[in-house]
Amino acid sequence: MNRTMKALFALGMVVGAAAAEAQGLDPALIGKPATDSWPTYSGDYSGRRFSPLTQIDQTNIKNLGLSWVSRLAAGPGTPGRPSQAFGPGNPPTIVGGETDDPVPVRNAGRISGAVLQVNGILYVSVPDNAWAVDARNGTVLWHYFWKTKGGTHIGNRGMGMYKDWLYFETPDDYLVSLDAKTGKERWHKPIADFNEQYFSTVAPIVIGNHLIVGTADDLDAPGFLQSFDPETGELQWKWYTEPEKMGDPGSETWPNLDSMRHGGGGPWLPGSYDPQLHLYYFGTANPTPAFSGVTRKGDNLYTSTIVALNVDTGKLAWYFQPSPHDTHDWDAAQTPVIVDGEFKGKPRKLLLDASRNGYFFVLDRVTGEHLLTVPYSDAPNWSKGIDKSGRPIPNPEKEASPGGVLVAPDSDGIVNWEPPAFDPQTGLFYVSTDDIYSEFYRTEPNPRAMQGLNGVFEQRVGQGGNYITAIDYKTGKIVWRHLQPSVSGTGSNDGLTATAGKLLFGGDVNGNLVAYDPTDGKPLWHTHIGQVSNAVETYMLDGRQYILAASGDTLYAFALNF
């Protein structure tokens, strides 16, 4: 047998063994804390990104070393690349899509979402691409490529899984279902009108027999959340982020029907879920026009809003709006974190949210009652105070003007899409923050021409630093802040993950993967891999705990060197 045949035979044995191991995912198990798996966007439904694994801890973190590296080649039939220093290349690509003339896309290979880990297999996605990878050694088992019509390839937040089936959204607005064992397509369904310039990036969330997906648009179309049957792909319900007609609840926060129908607010990040209350919590995007409120006077519900929906019906249970009348593209899209804990001496079911606008909120997740609002950075200067419902009051003098106005934070926010973490052992909420100041100049004298993201020039003029910030949710006080060392003085935030091994993992602005002490932010270990995408994940296989991180188009798995 020649070397090529031996390599192909070896790959077949690996794929066969991995496929035999994969037995699918029971949806009922997603709600349990992640131990030997990472079955949904945040590891479980809570949004806390906390793992109970303890094999890797403060006493042995110095022995953490690289176990394997796997670079994922996006595109149609890209030649295979070795997944390890030696070994077979990638398997043939499975191609899907509805066009014979796909639009070429550059730089679509960055992993910017969650990587699922179920039964020893990693499931990874970027725009138009999905892979299965052996979680023990990084071998690519299959690759699926979607021939796209185009759209906004801003990122893909990951996949959802139900039994033996995977689901992901495409930038040209399709929901695609794959066989997890083979990568072959089961079906695909349009979920939005591509001609209206919607784009779809959200990681689908599986809740029982519901597949929850969101769709967004920065060009004046209304956003919506939808639920599909994971078996058939049939639509179960659809909830718009603006009222559908005048007279509906919330319509009084818009001046007219036209502004409401072009109001934006699409959800573009996954939410969290309470199985006891049967409520799904998520945030919506900014209203449009993004930087001018002249044509949309009012609070503009339900944009830049935290929303609770009944999973079975799609009916609104409650809402809270962190950024009323948002005119700086801040959204409220961050994944809410749900915690059961004491607040002011009483046990409460809580929802925690660090918003892009620089304010930290604590809500009662049963009723939506506001409990706490406090800035978690010194930077925010756009609010005149807090109203009786706990919402910051926008200062109209901080809207873009021809002469420019200094606003903090900038349009990217104190935090953007990178997920926070909550550690029940310390009781602290952790978030990566970036204090940046911008001058906002209005460049379009006609407010009716300021559609979408147009009509404003933003000049970033200063930065107060990148931090990891630890917040006591009971008081809103900052317990500690760790200033990220930066050669340039600027950088990007990364998501965070906490473990029961008394570790907090994240990336820094210089491209290091870092383990911190969650009690004080002291760095305990680091290694350079490039900017960490999304956030670290962790899982246990064969008695060995792995730390998984992505940077660019590459996966890095670390484990203890025994």
List the predicted regions and their residue ranges:
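Repeat-blade elements of multi-bladed beta-propeller folds
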Residues: 38-42, 105-128, 151-175, 199-222, ...
